[in-house]
From Swiss-Prot:
Protein name as catalogued: Glycogen debranching enzyme
Its EC number(s): 2.4.1.25, 3.2.1.33
SUPFAM superfamilies with a match to the protein in the record: (Trans)glycosidases (SSF51445), Six-hairpin glycosidases (SSF48208)
Annotated positions of the Phosphoserine modification: S64
GO cellular component: cytoplasm
Length: 1533
């Protein structure tokens, strides 16, 4: 948490294409690309077009990024490549896996806007924009006096509609010349230029602190643009787009119909020039179907000339030398090939297919005639289909046309155009026609004359519900034919093609236009962005950003889908999307939009500086009204202007409005027809003055106040937002600063209905505002005044003079005219709430309060922030140092906690329910939800890690914190009740919590999290500092796995290990709380949580020693490892180490492998630990010096460890045979009587250790049947008697090691001496070692050669090239089962294996057994395989009931570690290429463990999963040996 640089990480996943995901970043951020689990280990290269420092951006130029590995380790969990973002715009990245593109996306970096003489930064959230229709500003020398209104109103950005020469329609967006300044702005004696505009823009920026942006219009140009007639190829005309010919013919026919209707020619048929009702509309429909369509034969453009085609076909049939076509391709049917020139009956068919389809049975004329008739019939059918299709298009065309007529002439909300005339035709024309009138037939002849047809150009417009990524004028679209275009008859649609070479003039012209704009303005608004070809906009914006690197790009998108919006935002690098408050139907929806478009919830969690890059929604420019919107005074009421604009300006994003709104202009200011000028600023003007305005006009005075407030809130970090819908009309919006905990609360009473004609209640609900109201920032009411009523002025765009606002700023609460009474209510001891009773909060009123925490809470927050600065500089602002705090807080937390041992950290961080219950406690339970997994801090952190990134303040965990102090007290009291440093940590937390309890409840989750995450990360660092350098310098994955050691190794209230010899001087001791006497407190390893964590079921010999190397030796916890080895050595009996330890006194000696795992651990200890061989001479207190002695207390009989080792070896060669003590249901309620007979020994011929019988299960696969219903009770599922492969491997490892030590005289024995048939015999370690070596592969390997004479049971072999699971089992077929156990032997005794054979077996295991996390415990091809473990199921199925298949398929994790380590070892012997592939496999498998570890609330790896990695509810959630063997694999890497 310490560093303050903002870093975001983006995880790359295989085949993940994120083109529709918006990632927003700021300049100065670092972006790190990291490998997701699917890519770890693979050769991945990331490419981006983000330029190298000092280079200019080129969208097409990609370069690769270098990988950095902070730990220099082989695992990929921390590997990243990075970008330091210093440039605004849209940048693409993609990544290759080898040479194949595997995924990618875009990032958008926000521009930095600067303003003022000092060039200070204007944050995007501070923008307050106003739109001006430039043509209404008048002559250029009068602009300043009109723009001053925006300055005085507090706006800091002006959006000008296009400043270029306008087309004939005078629409602001139909430009006749993109490069020329509109001549209307010049005077007869003074011509103004772009240079003058640039100077004004610069003055506004420097002197007025106002930035200027303007539109760029790329889609169309005015129909009278001179250059489009010089370069007709720039438009969609009938030469370059012949597919539009049928639509053009229809368009002309409709124009002639319109002229005829205007002249009264259809009056008799029911259609006069003035269309007034539905009957006339139906008559139009009838006329079109009966008079128009039959005349123009549109279908002919899509049909074949039947006569011509048949004659051509006949000619081909009768050709002497026509090539005989064999059987036609059945997929190829005869179909019409569209004539690319779209001539009538100009379509064709493929004659080859025709000849292959219609074959005459001989060459006679009758056969040929018959064939031609069939061909004719098929062509007629195909033509009929086209006719039908055109009919379908014509049906849609009539419907669209009538919809248009209805809107323009009949609809209440339409323009009501009046009679049909040439100026206002029946429908807008879709194409230009720059020629004299002529007859339809003469007109049609023009479409085939290129020099004429090129001037018949398609108009632009928009299509309702169309896909914005599809160009509706391109071939394949029928929009013009179906009349689906809502057409702008003054503009021609521009045809760019795919690249500049496709239309060089147009691209160059528009690029120049863009460059003029970017030279003089700080930003652009992309007009009609959703129908601008995206590649064109990209090209133009790239040119603009070359001149204006921090270009502010705004756009309006009407795609109807956030995914589609994101494609435009990400590819174009749009800075802000325009959002309209006018889209809200009521105040409730308006409030929802405020919450949607910006800010985080009040009381949000503090996010770390390094965090995942999360998908964003586009930054909003939230406008109370845009220049396209209809007038809100008409739609709502004049009284709503003030409250709605206040609600909008309280949003935590950019905000904006349009000139005329503040003056209360009661009609829409039309971008097409408005020719009057805006008002000028004059402080002295009277309300009746129509040409001038000041603070007495409209809502200008209030607008200035809310604009200034909007800018302050954005600049000062009031980033948290809360919206409260007080009642149907009142919306309260809170903006809160998370650093100084001040709030600004606006209460707006909207007036969507006119208060003069609608009822509004006098009763306004009381409001409760938490904290202390410092001042009323603003109170304003919309009122009427006595002056002349509104009359539309002829020269100026004037507003309503009779409505204004009464405002008061920065007053005390008691001076307010809107608040009647403010009382103080306290909710609980630290909640300071003010109750507000309103009077005069009339519709159209707003009041804004500035609220601080009550002084007591403010101090408490300040002190908390002061103490939190030790964890993060984020808390510096708003912090407060005091002298009278608890003395413990004067000590940094790290120095208090640094004294904690790892065993104490186990108590502070972990302890599951059953461990905690031993101490009389338990895990914290959140009512109506669940209990925490751990009583320690990890239990809380697991939940906070889920809810913090999502800011899920509604989670039951947060509810519990807000509702009371129970959880807070639990955390500190649990620790204080213990002794020593743990209690000190508890006291530090308690002192912090004292202040936490004094702050408002809504802030408690955020600060509770901040305290805990600071403490938690410090504690983790303290843990790692006590571990080996492998951990300290390891990757995040290694570090998080190593915490499994802290999780599993601890000391309970009652020590689980037998006492060690008192003559050991470095044992840990503690004072017993009850007896007050000193007692040993050695840590023991739990086998797994939560099932094997406390009491006699905590410690198991086999689990302990499989886990010990990974959890204690690799992590550097040598003392704990030694103590556990010696404690178990003390319990040796019958030459065996117990499985269930039961503190030694309740031990069960029913396993054959624990002793060999114990010996392997002693060997590992000697090799890993400095001076590790010293352990061989350490005293072992024997609990059972003889097989039958009673348990002796520590120190009674001590002997060095090497003697105990020799005894274990001796007893095995001698042969072990005994019956378990207390045999029967009291120690095992399922075992059959014979199962309690234990045997083990060493085969004289082979040297293999063997043992067991078919009624017991002495290896790790130890499931005993327990179902009476399925009749498997007392039968082991996997007895594995005989010589189990991993035990043979482990014994070989032990024998080889002891041989080496004896040769160096470190181990005093060279042999074992045993009694056989009454005589003493010696077996040397050398001989024993050789026997295993000579026999292992011969007897365990299943040869790929079926005639191998070593094979005793060739009939049982069903997989070749593997190693048997056992040798000499009582059921011979069990030997031949494929299981993962042979990989253990490969790791501990690789010398037993021929590398090539080992590799083959490993490949089979990988293919058949390797799952996502674990290894299948049985070959899935085996008839008893079942991969789903359900211990609760009791049915008749012998193989499944009561979890009988525990080791018959489910995927266990710990063998995966051995499999991967074996692969790594043997891959090195198989050559560099194999080794590289294996490294990938290992990293890839481990990455899945990493993902599981990070996501697991237990922060561990499970015992097993069901097949294919599915969750198994019966598994331990975190298992010692699972974590250990994965950690060992990373150690081997």
């Amino acid at each position: 948490m310490g560093h303050s640089k903002q870093i975001r990480t983006l995880l790359l996943n295989e085949m993940e294409k994120l083109e529709k995901t918006l990632f927003r970043l700021e300049q100065g951020f670092e972006l790190q690309f990291r490998l997701g689990p699917t890519l770890q280990g693979k050769a991945v290269t990331v490419y981006t077009n983000y330029p190298f420092p000092g280079e200019t951006f080129n969208r097409e130029k990609f370069h690769s990024l270098q990988w950095e590995n902070p730990t220099e380790r082989e695992d990929d969990s921390d590997k990243y490549c990075k970008l330091n973002l210093q440039q605004a715009g849209s940048f693409q990245y993609y990544f290759l896996q080898g040479n194949e593109k595997s995924g990618g996306g875009y990032i958008v970096v926000d521009p930095i806007l600067r303003v003022g003489a000092d060039n200070h930064v204007l944050p995007l959230d501070c923008v307050t924009l106003q739109t001006f229709l430039t043509k209404c500003l008048g002559p250029f020398d009068e602009w300043e006096s009109r723009l001053r209104v925006a300055k005085e109103s507090g706006y800091n950005m002006i959006h000008f509609t296009p400043l270029q020469t306008l087309g004939l329609s005078r629409s602001s967006y139909s430009l006749a010349d993109q490069l020329e300044l509109n001549p209307d702005f010049s005077r007869p004696n003074k011509k103004y230029t772009w240079h003058d505009v640039g100077q004004l823009v610069e003055k506004l920026k420097k002197e007025w602190d106002i930035l200027c942006i303007t539109d760029v219009v790329y889609n169309h140009t005015a129909a009278n643009s001179k250059w489009i007639h010089e370069h007709p190829e720039s438009a969609y005309n009938l030469v370059n787009s012949p597919h539009l010919k049928p639509a053009w013919v229809l368009d002309r026919a409709l124009w002639h119909l319109s002229c005829d209707v205007a002249e009264g020619k259809y009056r008799e048929k029911g259609v006069p020039a003035l269309i007034e009702n539905d009957h006339q509309m139906n008559c139009i429909r009838k006329i079109i179907w009966e008079d128009i369509y039959p005349k123009i034969h549109l279908w002919e453009f899509f049909q074949v000339d039947v006569h011509k085609a048949v004659e051509q076909f006949r000619g081909l049939l009768t050709q002497e030398n026509r090539k005989i076509i064999s059987q036609p391709d059945p997929k190829q049917h005869l179909k019409i090939i569209q004539d690319p020139e779209y001539r009538r009956l100009g379509c064709t068919v493929d004659m080859n297919i025709a000849l292959a389809t219609f074959i005459p049975h001989d060459n006679g004329p009758a056969a040929i005639d018959e064939c031609c008739n069939w061909f004719r019939k098929r062509i007629e059918e195909l033509n009929a289909e086209k006719h039908q299709l055109v009919n379908y298009h014509q049906e849609q065309a009539v419907n669209c046309l009538l919809g248009n007529v209805f809107y323009e002439r009949l609809a209440g909300h339409g323009p009501k155009l009046g009679p049909v005339t040439r100026k206002h035709p029946l429908v807008t024309r879709y194409f230009t026609f720059p020629f004299e009138e002529m007859t339809p037939s003469t007109e049609e002849s023009m479409i085939h004359l290129p020099n004429k047809a090129c001037f018949l150009m398609a108009h632009n417009g928009w299509v309702m519900g169309d896909d914005p990524l599809r160009n509706f004028a391109e071939p394949g679209s029928d929009v013009y034919l179906r009349r689906e275009l809502i057409c702008w008859g003054d503009s021609v649609k521009l045809r760019y093609g795919n690249k500049p070479e496709d239309c060089p003039y147009l691209w160059a012209h528009m690029k120049k236009y863009t460059e003029i704009t970017a030279t003089h303005f700080q930003g652009v608004r992309l007009d009609n962005c959703h129908s601008t070809p995206i590649h064109v906009a990209e090209y133009m914006l790239d040119a603009a950003r070359k001149l204006q690197p921090n270009l502010y790009v705004v756009a309006e998108l009407f795609t109807g889908s956030e995914d589609l919006d994101n494609i435009f935002v990400t590819r174009l690098g749009i800075s802000s999307l325009i959002r309209e408050a006018m889209s809200a139907a009521d105040s409730h929806e308006e409030g929802r939009l405020v919450y949607r478009y910006g800010g985080e919830p009040v009381g949000s969690f503090v996010q770390p500086c390094l965090r995942p890059l999360m998908p964003a929604i586009a930054h909003a420019l939230f406008m109370d009204i845009t220049h396209d919107n209809e007038c809100p005074i008409v739609h709502r009421s004049a009284y709503d202007a003030l409250p709605s604009s206040t609600i909008v300006s309280m949003a935590s994003c950019a905000s904006g409005s349009t000139k005329g709104y503040d003056e209360l202009v009661p009609h829409q200011i039309s971008v097409v027809s408005e020719e009057r000028f805006y008002t000028k600023w004059n402080p002295e003007a009277l309300p009746s003055n129509t040409g001038e305005v000041n603070f007495q006009s409209g809502i200008i005075a209030a607008r200035r106040a809310i604009n200034k407030l909007h800018q302050e809130l954005g600049a000062k970090g009031f980033i948290q937002v809360y919206v409260d819908q007080v009642d149907q009309d009142i919306v309260a919006v809170t903006r809160h600063s998370p650093s100084i905990h001040q709030s600004v609360v606006s209460v707006s009473r909207t007036a969507f209905r006119n208060p003069k004609t609608s009822f509004y209640s006098k009763e306004v609900p009381h409001m409760y505002i938490p904290g202390k109201i410092e001042e009323v920032v603003l109170e304003a009411r919309t009122i009427e005044r006595h002056t002349i009523p509104y009359k539309k002025d002829e020269n100026s765009i004037n507003g309503m003079p009779d409505i204004t606002v009464e405002i008061r700023e920065h007053i005390q609460l008691n001076e307010s005219k809107i608040v009647k009474h403010a009382g103080i209510v306290t909710k609980g001891p630290n909640e300071f709430v003010q109750e507000i009773e309103f009077e005069n909060l009339t519709p159209g009123s707003v009041i804004i309060f500035r609220v601080s925490l009550d002084p007591h809470a403010q101090v408490a927050v300040g002190i908390l922030r002061n103490h939190l600065t030790q964890f993060s500089p984020h808390f510096k602002s708003g912090s407060l140092a005091v002298d009278n705090a608890d003395p413990i807080l004067k000590i940094p937390f790290a120095s208090i906690a640094s004294k904690l041992t790892l065993a104490e950290l186990n108590q502070v961080l972990y302890r599951c329910e059953s461990e905690e219950q031993e101490d009389g406690g338990g895990c914290y339970n959140i009512p109506n939800w669940s209990s925490l997994k751990y009583a320690g801090l990890q239990g809380l952190m697991s939940i906070l890690a889920e809810i913090r990134p999502r800011n899920d303040l509604g989670h039951p965990f947060c509810d519990n914190l807000r509702s009371g102090d129970w959880m807070i007290d639990y955390v500190s009291s649990r620790l204080i009740s213990r002794s020593g440093t743990i209690a000190e940590v508890g006291k530090w937390l308690q002192a912090m919590f004292l202040y936490l309890k004094q702050i408002p409840r809504y802030l408690i989750p955020c600060y509770f999290d901040a305290i805990l995450i600071g403490a938690y990360t410090t504690l983790l660092d303290i843990a790692w500092k006590q571990m080996s350098s492998f951990v300290q310098n390891g990757s995040t994955f290694v570090k998080h796995l190593s915490l499994g050691s802290v999780q599993m190794c601890g000391v309970g209230k009652f020590p689980s290990l037998p006492l060690l010899s008192p003559s050991l001087t470095d044992l840990p001791y503690r004072v017993n709380e009850i007896t007050k006497e000193k007692e040993q407190c050695c840590g023991s390893l739990a086998a797994g949580l939560p099932h094997f964590s406390a009491g006699i079921f905590r410690c198991w010999g086999r689990d302990t020693f499989i886990a010990l190397r990974g959890l204690l030796l690799v992590t550097g916890r040598y003392l704990e490892a030694r103590n556990i080895i010696l404690a178990f050595a003390g319990t040796l009996r019958h030459g065996l180490i117990p499985n269930l330890l039961g503190e030694g006194t309740h031990a069960r000696y029913n396993c054959r492998d624990a002793v060999w795992w114990w010996l392997q651990c002693i060997q590992d200890y000697c090799k890993i630990v400095p001076n590790g061989l010293d352990i061989l001479r350490c005293p072992v207190s024997r609990m059972y010096p003889t097989d039958d002695s009673v348990p002796l207390s520590a120190g009674t009989v001590d002997q060095p460890l090497f003697e105990v080792i020799q005894e274990a070896m001796q007893r095995h060669v001698q042969g072990i045979q005994f019956r378990e003590r207390n045999a029967g249901p009291q120690i095992d309620r399922n075992m059959k009587d014979e199962g309690f007979n234990i045997t083990a020994g060493v085969d004289e011929e082979t040297g293999f250790v063997y043992g067991g019988n078919r009624f017991n299960c002495g290896t790790w696969m130890d499931k005993m049947g327990e179902s009476d219903r399925a009749r498997n009770r007392g039968i082991p599922a996997t007895p594995r008697d005989g010589s189990a492969v991993e035990i043979v491997g482990l014994s070989k490892s032990a024998v080889r090691w002891l041989l080496e030590l004896s040769r160096k005289n470190i181990f005093p024995y060279h042999e074992v001496r045993v009694k056989r048939h009454g005589k003493f015999v010696t077996v040397s370690y050398d001989e024993w070692n050789r026997k295993i070596q000579d026999n292992f592969e011969k007897l365990f390997h299943v040869s790929e050669d079926p005639s191998d004479f070593n094979e005793k049971h060739p009939e049982l072999v069903h997989k070749r090239g593997i190693y048997k699971d056992s040798y000499g089992a009582s059921s011979p077929w069990c030997d031949y089962q494929l299981r993962p156990n042979f990989t253990i032997a490969m790791v501990v005794a690789p010398e037993l294996f021929t590398p090539e054979k080992a590799w083959k077996a490993l490949e089979i295991a990988e293919k058949k057994l390797l799952g996502p996390l674990g290894m299948k415990t049985l070959d899935p091809d085996d008839m008893v395989y079942c991969g789903i473990y359900d211990n609760a199921l009791d049915n008749d199925n012998y193989n499944l009931a009561k979890g009988f298949n525990y080791h018959q398929g489910p995927e266990w994790l710990w063998p995966t570690g051995y499999f991967l380590r074996a692969k790594l070892y043997f891959s090195k012997l198989m050559g560099p290429e194999t080794n590289a592939k294996t490294m990938f496999l290992v990293k890839n498998v481990l990455s899945r463990h990493y993902v599981h570890l990070e996501r697991s609330p237990w922060k561990g790896l499970p015992e097993l999963t069901n097949e294919n990695g599915q969750y198994c509810p019966f598994s331990c959630e975190t298992q010692a040996w699972s974590i250990a063997t994965v950690l060992e694999t990373l150690y081997d890497l």
